[in-house]
From Swiss-Prot:
The record marks Y366 as: Transition state stabilizer. Protease activity of LC inhibited by arginine hydroxamate. This is Botulinum neurotoxin type A2. Induction: The toxin locus has divergently transcribed operons maximally expressed during early stationary phase. This is part of the p47-ntnh-botA operon; no botA-specific transcript was seen. The crude toxin extract was isolated from cells that had been growing statically for 96 hours (at protein level). It comes from Clostridium botulinum (strain Kyoto / Type A2). The lineage of its organism: Bacteria, Bacillati, Bacillota, Clostridia, Eubacteriales. The chain crosses the membrane at residues 627-647, 656-676.
C-alpha cells in the first residue's frame, strides 16, 4: 500500500479535504496557499516560503555580507504551475521511495504518530491542543476549519538550497526539547541536489577517476524528516550545544560550529563525536521529560477544544511515548521501553543508515561540505525511480553508483554556475622569501609585492581540529552506590540486523485519526522560532610561515594548461614558482624519463614505459613487522604531502618506524583523563541481602566505568585523530590524480608535436592511457587506505587505550580498597560470605576488560582493520612475550609475571631473540594470573613461536628427547620438546592419555631450510577434531584429539632445556604467543607475514642483515656454487665457482660447506642509519674481501649490452664507475631470507639486479636490467636472488 493517498496534480480542484487552500500559524495577513494532504497529518505546499517568517519574504539575494557560506539564489524558481506540479510529484515520489524501505516505513509511521503533546492549557488538569500546531483549512464555501497536523513540506525561501526543519512557533525552542514536540515544516526542493567527492569503494577496492557524485534527494529529505521526528517527540538537542573547532593555526578549518543535533541526525562516525558523558546527559534529560508528560496525563481530568474523548487522546500519547499503564489507568515511563524508543529515534533513524537501505553512495561525513549544486528532474522514471533512485538497473547505471556519477550520467545533472560554496572562503598561507621570477597565476594568492609566496587554501580543505570544549569530563565525580543503584544494560551497536529486529517488532497499525479541532482564530499567532545567527567565515586571513605545508606541496603538483610543455621536478619550490613546472614525489629516474623528448618511432615504447613506471612508483610499499599495528608503509606519502617535513621516502619510513603514527599527525591530540572518582558505598545494618547486592552493584558499576572510559576514548580518537587521517587520505587521492594529470599532459603534448604522417603511424589513444593510470591509482589506494587505517587504529591502540587502561587500573585499585574495607566493616553481617566476596572482588578487579572497537564504531573499514590485525589475534592472545624496556614483558594486556634466570641471554642486535643454554639457571618462568587462567584448555587454543635449533653434532643427541617449553602440572597439560631432527607437540589429559604431533626434518641434506635457521612454529588445537602443527605457515602434521579427556593446564609455563644430555646444547627462541582460540590458516599466515619483519633484510640464518659484517654468498638459482674473484681491477671479474665441498659426520649430518668463497661486506652509503641494520631499499656499497683486503664491487655502465660485468676494484680507483647498490627484500618462492641487489649508475638510474651470465661457460657476475624486467612477471627464482651467510656457532663449520 503506498504512503501517499493518491496521485495529485497541482491543477486538481480544491475539495477542502486533501486539496485545499490553507493558512499557517504566524503568517499574518498571508494569502491562503494551495496545499495537498499526501497522508494523515502531512501536507505539501508547492510554493516558495515567503510567509512562515515575515523577515524572509524577499526572494532576491541579500547583500553579500549577509549571505551564508553555502547558498544559491533564483527568485524565479517555483513560480509557474508546471514547476509547482513537478515539485508536488517530486516530493510525493521521494516519500514513496523512503516508505518503500523498512527503515523509511518505520520513520514515517513514527512521524504520523508523533502528534505534538496537548499542553496548551494553563490549567494542569486540562488537555488542550497548542494552537500553533494547527492550520486553518479554507472550505469551498469560504469558511474555514482548524486541523491539527504534524508536518508540512514547503518550498525553499530566498536561498534555494537552504533545506531546514523548523517549527511554526509558540515558544518552540522549549517544545522541541521538553518532550512535548511541535508541528514542523521542512523547507525543501526535490529539484536540486548537492555534489560531493568520495573515493568509491567496492569490495575494498577504491575506484578513482570516476568523477563527482550527486546526493540522492531521498537521502536529503530523509535527513530533514529525522530532524522533524526529533522535534515532534521533543528530543531535539539545544542548538546551543555545538561541536566547536579550533581556528588559531594555519591548518585549522575556520568559523565552523556543527550542532550536536546535526551530528546525531547524520549518524555514523559523526554521532560518535558526541562523547558518552554528554549522550548520557541527553538521555537522562529526555527520560525525565517523558516522565513529566506521563505526570501531566495522570493529572488531566478533562479535555477542551475538541470532540475527541480524554481517554482517546491519552491512548494516542501512550502510543507515541510507549508509556506503561497500570490497572488504575496511571501512566509511567518504563526505562527499558524508553531506551528502546530513544535508540530508535536517535540512533536507528540516521542519514547514514538510510544510505544502506537506499543502496546509494553518500558523503562519508557531515563535514564533507557541498562543493557543487545540480538542477535535477526526478519525476520521469527514465531519470529516477522509487526503487533504484538514479542508479537504474535497466540503463546500466547501477554499477559503481554510475547513476549518481555526474559525469557518467551527465544528462540528469545540470551544474549551477552561480552557486556560492565554501570554496569562496579561504586562508592565505605565505612562506617568507624573495620571488625572483614569474610565478604561477593559479589564483590571486601569490603576492609578489610582499616578496612572499602565498597560496589560497579553501576552508573545507583544512583540518577539522576539534576544541577541547567539546569533551566533557565528569569522570572524577564520586558516585554513591546503594542496593538500588541502577545498572545500565550493555548497549548494542547499531547494525542492519538490529534495525531489522526493530522493524519486525514495530506496530504499524493504530494510526491516529483526524481529530476535530475547535476553530481557532483565522490568523494563528504564536512566538516565532529565533533565526540562528550565521556569521560569514573570516575570509582571506593571512598566515606567515617559515616552511612549506601540505597545501603548498599539493599546489606545486598543479600546472597551467597551455601550449608549452609541462616539466616535472622533485623540487616543490621550483614548481611553485614556475607556471609550466609540476612537482612530483616520484623518483628522479621517472622525472628524467618523462622530461625527455622522444622521436615518433620511440613514442609508444616511451609512453608504455612511463605507464609501467607510474605503476611501480604508486605501488611502492615498505613492509613492517608489528602485529596489530602497521604492517606496511607507503613511503611516498611523506614527500607527496610534506608530512612532518619529510622530504624523502626514507626519512618518512624511518619516522614511522622510530616515532610511530605521531609523525603523520598535523596536530598532536590532547587526551587527558582525570583521577577517576571512586565509590561512596552505603551501609545497611544487619541486612545481608542488601549489603551483598550493594557489593554486586559496585562491581557492575566498575564495569560500566570501563565501558564509559572506552567510549569516551573512542570519541576523542574519531574526532582528533581519525579526521586527520581521513584528510590525508583525501589529499593523497588528489596527489595521485595530480601525477596522473601531469603524466597525461606531458605524453599528450609530446604526441601533438609530431606531424600528421607520424601520428598516423602511431596507434595512440589518450583514453586508454587514462584508464591504465587510473587502474594504477586504484591499486595504490588499496595500499594507502590499508596503511592509513592501520595508522589510525594503531594510534588508538598504542597511545590512547593503554593510557585509558592505566587510569582504569588505578581506579580499580581504589575500588578494591573501598570494597574490601566495606566487607571488613560489615563482616558481622556477612559472616560466611566474607571470604567468597573478597575473592569475587579480587578476581573481578584483577582482570582487565578487553577493548572491543566494534562496541563503539560501525565503520566497516576500521573494524576490518581492527579485526584483522588486533581482534582475531591480539585479543585472543593470553600471552605475548616480547623484549621491551630492558626486560621481557607480556603484551597481551593480561600482564603475566615473568621470572628470568641468571643465564638467559639476549641477542645484541635483536633482543627479542633469547638464548637458553643447558643449565639450571637458564630458565624463563611465566606465571599467568589466576583470574586469567582460562577454561579454553578444555576447548580450543593455539600457540606460536620462532625457534632456531643448532645443528646436532654428535651421537649423544640421538634418541634424546628433551623439553623446552613445559605447561604440564599433575600429569596434565601440554609441552614442546625436541629430538634429533624433530619438533614435538604433546597434549596429555588428566588420565595421562597422550597425543603427539611432530615436525621432522633431516640433517642429511646439502643445504637445509631448517638446520640452525629461524623457523616459525604454530600449533592449533580443536578439541572436537585435531591438533595441527604448522611450520613457516604450512601445515605439516595433524592428529585427532577428540578422544582426549579434560586437560588441566598449569598457570605456569617453563622455558628450559629439561632432560638434554648434551651439556653444550642451546636453543634460540622469540615471539612466544598463546591464544585462546584455534587460529585459522589465514591468521597463521598473517602472523607469519607480520612477524617476519620483511622491511628488514635477513641473513641466511634469519638474523638481521648488518653493515660491516663479512658474509659468504649463496645464489638461490645455483646454490651449489660459491662466489670467487678472477682478478682485481676493471679487467678482472667475479664469478660462480663450484661445486661446494661437503661436511660429513656419519649418521649425524651430511651438508654442503657454506663458509666458502669470497666474502661480501655491506657498507653504508650515508650516515643516517644508526642501528647497523640493513633495510629494504637501503642504498649501500658492497665490498668484497680478497686475501683479507677489502675491494669495492663496481662496474663500467658504458659497457655494451644489457649485462654489465662486475669487478672488484681498489676503493680509491673506483672513480666515476657505478658502485651504489639498492638492497631489496621480497618473499621468493617461500624463501624469506633472500635478497636482491640493484646496481645504479651515478645519476640514480638502474643498471640492473646483480646476478650472473655465462660467458664461455664461466658464470660471471653481472648487473642486468633483464632481471628487473622479468622479476614480477614470473614466480620462479632468478639468478639475482642471493642469501648472505655469516659465521654462526650453531652451524659448526670452520670458516676460511
Amino acid at each position: 500500500m503506498p504512503f501517499v493517498n493518491k496521485q495529485f496534480n497541482y491543477k486538481d480542484p480544491v475539495n477542502g479535504v486533501d486539496i485545499a487552500y490553507i493558512k499557517i500559524p504566524n503568517a499574518g495577513q498571508m494569502q491562503p496557499v494551495k496545499a495537498f494532504k499526501i497522508h494523515n497529518k502531512i501536507w505539501v505546499i508547492p510554493e516558495r516560503d515567503t510567509f512562515t517568517n515575515p523577515e524572509e519574504g524577499d526572494l532576491n539575494p541579500p547583500p553579500e555580507a549577509k549571505q551564508v557560506p553555502v547558498s544559491y539564489y533564483d527568485s524565479t524558481y517555483l513560480s509557474t504551475d508546471n514547476e509547482k506540479d513537478n515539485y508536488l510529484k517530486g516530493v510525493t515520489k521521494l516519500f514513496e521511495r523512503i516508505y518503500s524501505t523498512d527503515l523509511g516505513r518505520m520513520l514515517l509511521t513514527s512521524i504520523v504518530r508523533g502528534i505534538p503533546f496537548w499542553g496548551g492549557s494553563t490549567i494542569d488538569t486540562e488537555l488542550k491542543v497548542i494552537d500553533t500546531n494547527c492550520i486553518n483549512v479554507i472550505q469551498p464555501d469560504g469558511s474555514y476549519r482548524s486541523e491539527e497536523l504534524n508536518l508540512v513540506i514547503i518550498g525553499p525561501s530566498a536561498d534555494i538550497i537552504q533545506f531546514e526543519c523548523k517549527s511554526f512557533g509558540h515558544d518552540v525552542l522549549n517544545l522541541t526539547r521538553n518532550g512535548y514536540g511541535s508541528t514542523q515544516y521542512i523547507r525543501f526542493s526535490p529539484d536540486f541536489t548537492f555534489g560531493f567527492e568520495e573515493s568509491l569503494e567496492v569490495d575494498t577496492n577504491p575506484l578513482l577517476g570516476a568523477g563527482k557524485f550527486a546526493t540522492d534527494p531521498a537521502v536529503t529529505l530523509a535527513h530533514e524528516l529525522i530532524h522533524a521526528e526529533h522535534r515532534l517527540y521533543g528530543i531535539a538537542i539545544n542548538p546551543n550545544r555545538v561541536f566547536k573547532v579550533n581556528t588559531n593555526a594555519y591548518y585549522e578549518m575556520s568559523g565552523l560550529e556543527v550542532s550536536f543535533e546535526e551530528l546525531r541526525t547524520f549518524g555514523g562516525h559523526d554521532a560518535k563525536f558526541i562523547d558518552s558523558l554528554q549522550e548520557n546527559e541527553f538521555r537522562l534529560y529526555y527520560y525525565n521529560k517523558f516522565k513529566d508528560v506521563a505526570s501531566t496525563l495522570n493529572k488531566a481530568k478533562s479535555i477542551i477544544g475538541t470532540t475527541a474523548s480524554l481517554q482517546y487522546m491519552k491512548n494516542v500519547f501512550k502510543e507515541k511515548y510507549l508509556l506503561s499503564e497500570d490497572t488504575s489507568g496511571k501512566f509511567s515511563v518504563d526505562k527499558l521501553k524508553f531506551d528502546k524508543l530513544y535508540k530508535m529515534l536517535t540512533e536507528i533513524y540516521t542519514e547514514d543508515n538510510f544510505v544502506n537501505f537506499f543502496k546509494v553512495i553518500n558523503r562519508k561525513t557531515y563535514l564533507n561540505f557541498d562543493k557543487a549544486v545540480f538542477r535535477i528532474n526526478i519525476v520521469p522514471d527514465e531519470n529516477y525511480t522509487i526503487k533504484d533512485g538514479f542508479n537504474l538497473k535497466g540503463a546500466n547505471l547501477s554499477t559503481n553508483f554510475n547513476g549518481q556519477n555526474t559525469e557518467i550520467n551527465s544528462r540528469n545533472f545540470t551544474r549551477l554556475k552561480n552557486f556560492t560554496g565554501l570554496f569562496e572562503f579561504y586562508k592565505l598561507l605565505c612562506v617568507r622569501g624573495i620571488i625572483p621570477f614569474k610565478t604561477k597565476s593559479l589564483d590571486e594568492g601569490y603576492n609578489k609585492a610582499l616578496n612572499d609566496l602565498c597560496i589560497k587554501v579553501n576552508n573545507w580543505d583544512l583540518f577539522f581540529s576539534p576544541s577541547e570544549d567539546n569533551f566533557t569530563n565528569d569522570l572524577d565525580k564520586v558516585e554513591e552506590i546503594t542496593a538500588d543503584t541502577n545498572i545500565e544494560a550493555a548497549e548494542e551497536n547499531i547494525s542492519l540486523d538490529l534495525i531489522q529486529q526493530y522493524y519486525l517488532t514495530f506496530d504499524f497499525d493504530n494510526e491516529p485519526e483526524n481529530i476535530s479541532i475547535e476553530n481557532l482564530s483565522s490568523d494563528i499567532i504564536g512566538q516565532l522560532e529565533p533565526m540562528p545567527n550565521i556569521e560569514r567565515f573570516p575570509n582571506g586571513k593571512k598566515y606567515e610561515l617559515d616552511k612549506y605545508t601540505m597545501f603548498h606541496y599539493l599546489r606545486a603538483q598543479e600546472f597551467e594548461h597551455g601550449d608549452s610543455r609541462i616539466i616535472l621536478t622533485n623540487s616543490a619550490e621550483e614548481a611553485l614558482l614556475k607556471p609550466n613546472v609540476a612537482y612530483t614525489f616520484f623518483s628522479s629516474k621517472y622525472v628524467k624519463k618523462i622530461n625527455k623528448a622522444v622521436e615518433a618511432f620511440m613514442f609508444l615504447n616511451w609512453a608504455e614505459e612511463l605507464v609501467y613506471d607510474f605503476t611501480d612508483e604508486t605501488n611502492e610499499v615498505t613492509t613492517m613487522d608489528k602485529i596489530a599495528d602497521i604492517t606496511i608503509i607507503v613511503p611516498y606519502i611523506g614527500p607527496a604531502l610534506n608530512i612532518g617535513n619529510m622530504l624523502s621516502k626514507g626519512e618518512f619510513v624511518e619516522a614511522i618506524i622510530f616515532t610511530g603514527v605521531v609523525a603523520m599527525l598535523e596536530f598532536i591530540p590532547e587526551y587527558a583523563l582525570p583521577v577517576f572518582g571512586t565509590f561512596a558505598i552505603v551501609s545497611y545494618i544487619a541486612n545481608k541481602v542488601l549489603t551483598v547486592q550493594t557489593i554486586n552493584n559496585a562491581l557492575s558499576k566498575r564495569n560500566e566505568k570501563w565501558d564509559e572510559v572506552y567510549k569516551y576514548t573512542v570519541t576523542n580518537w574519531l574526532a582528533k585523530v581519525n579526521t586527520q587521517i581521513d584528510l590525508i587520505r583525501e589529499k593523497m587521492k588528489k596527489a595521485l590524480e595530480n601525477q596522473a594529470e601531469a603524466t597525461k599532459a606531458i605524453i599528450n603534448y609530446q604526441y601533438n608535436q609530431y606531424t600528421e604522417e607520424e601520428k598516423n603511424n602511431i596507434n595512440f589513444n589518450i583514453d586508454d592511457l587514462s584508464s591504465k593510470l587510473n587502474e594504477s591509482i586504484n591499486s595504490a589506494m588499496i595500499n594507502i587506505n590499508k596503511f592509513l587505517d592501520q595508522c589510525s587504529v594503531s594510534y588508538l591502540m598504542n597511545s590512547m587505550i593503554p593510557y585509558a587502561v592505566k587510569r582504569l587500573k588505578d581506579f580499580d585499585a581504589s575500588v578494591r580498597d573501598v570494597l574490601l574495607k566495606y566487607i571488613y566493616d560489615n563482616r558481622g553481617t556477612l559472616v560466611l560470605q566474607v571470604d567468597r566476596l573478597k575473592d569475587e572482588v579480587n578476581n573481578t578487579l584483577s582482570a582487565d576488560i578487553p577493548f572491543q572497537l566494534s562496541k563503539y564504531v560501525d565503520n566497516k573499514k576500521l573494524l576490518s582493520t581492527f579485526t584483522e590485525y588486533i581482534k582475531n589475534i591480539v585479543n585472543t592472545s593470553i600471552l605475548s612475550i616480547v623484549y621491551k624496556k630492558d626486560d621481557l614483558i607480556d603484551l597481551s594486556r593480561y600482564g603475566a609475571k615473568i621470572n628470568i634466570g641468571d643465564r638467559v641471554y639476549y641477542d645484541s642486535i635483536d633482543k627479542n631473540q633469547i638464548k637458553l643454554i643447558n643449565l639450571e639457571s637458564s630458565t624463563i618462568e611465566v606465571i599467568l594470573k589466576n583470574a586469567i587462567v582460562y577454561n579454553s584448555m578444555y576447548e580450543n587454543f593455539s600457540t606460536s613461536f620462532w625457534i632456531k635449533i643448532p645443528k646436532y653434532f654428535s651421537k649423544i643427541n640421538l634418541n634424546n628427547e628433551y623439553t623446552i617449553i613445559n605447561c604440564i602440572e599433575n600429569n596434565s597439560g601440554w609441552k614442546v620438546s625436541l629430538n634429533y631432527g624433530e619438533i614435538i607437540w604433546t597434549l596429555q589429559d588428566n588420565k595421562q592419555n597422550i597425543q603427539r604431533v611432530v615436525f621432522k626434518y633431516s640433517q642429511m641434506v646439502n643445504i637445509s631450510d631448517y638446520i640452525n635457521r629461524w623457523i616459525f612454529v604454530t600449533i592449533t588445537n580443536n578439541r572436537l577434531t585435531k591438533s595441527k602443527i604448522y611450520i613457516n605457515g604450512r601445515l605439516i602434521d595433524q592428529k585427532p584429539i577428540s578422544n582426549l579427556g579434560n586437560i588441566h593446564a598449569s598457570n605456569k609455563i617453563m622455558f628450559k632445556l629439561d632432560g638434554c644430555r648434551d651439556p653444550r646444547r642451546y636453543i634460540m627462541i622469540k615471539y612466544f604467543n598463546l591464544f585462546d582460540k584455534e587460529l585459522n590458516e589465514k591468521e597463521i599466515k598473517d602472523l607469519y607475514d607480520s612477524q617476519s619483519n620483511s622491511g628488514i633484510l635477513k641473513d641466511f640464518w634469519g638474523n638481521y642483515l648488518q653493515y660491516d659484517k663479512p658474509y659468504y654468498m649463496l645464489n638461490l638459482f645455483d646454490p651449489n656454487k660459491y662466489v670467487d674473484v678472477n682478478n682485481i681491477g676493471i679487467r678482472g671479474y667475479m664469478y660462480l665457482k663450484g661445486p661446494r665441498g661437503s661436511v660429513v659426520t656419519t649418521n649425524i649430518y651430511l651438508n654442503s660447506t657454506l663458509y666458502e668463497g669470497t666474502k661480501f661486506i655491506i657498507k653504508k652509503y650515508a650516515s643516517g642509519n644508526e642501528d647497523n641494520i640493513v633495510r629494504n631499499n637501503d642504498r649501500v656499497y658492497i665490498n668484497v674481501v680478497v686475501k683479507n683486503k677489502e675491494y669495492r664491487l663496481a662496474t663500467n655502465a658504458s659497457q655494451a649490452g644489457v649485462e654489465k660485468i662486475l669487478s672488484a676494484l681498489e676503493i680509491p680507483d673506483v672513480g666515476n664507475l657505478s658502485q651504489v647498490v639498492v638492497m631489496k627484500s621480497k618473499d621468493d618462492q617461500g624463501i624469506r631470507n633472500k635478497c636482491k641487489m640493484n646496481l645504479q649508475d651515478n645519476n640514480g638510474n638502474d643498471i640492473g639486479f646483480i646476478g650472473f651470465h655465462l660467458y664461455d661457460n664461466i658464470a660471471k657476475l653481472v648487473a642486468s636490467n633483464w632481471y628487473n624486467r622479468q622479476v614480477g612477471k614470473a614466480s620462479r627464482t632468478f639468478g639475482c636472488s642471493w642469501e648472505f651467510i655469516p659465521v654462526d656457532d650453531g652451524w659448526g663449520e670452520s670458516s676460511l
